[in-house]
Amino acid sequence: MTKEMRSFVPILINNGYREIRSNGSHFIYSNGNNQITVNKDLNKMVRRRLIKENNLVER
């Protein structure tokens, strides 16, 4: 798990997402309505895109 992924997980949790499963190199998070698939080798650019596309709040 990369540094970016370790810092992204708390953002997901603070926005109501929880890990529902992992398969190979991907983690699947859901908040009941939306689902986000995150690669374990997440990089900075993809992290920023996921935050923007899913309207996540960084706290």
Regions found by a protein language model. Give the residues of each.
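Basic nucleic-acid-binding interfaces
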Residues: 2-23, 28-59
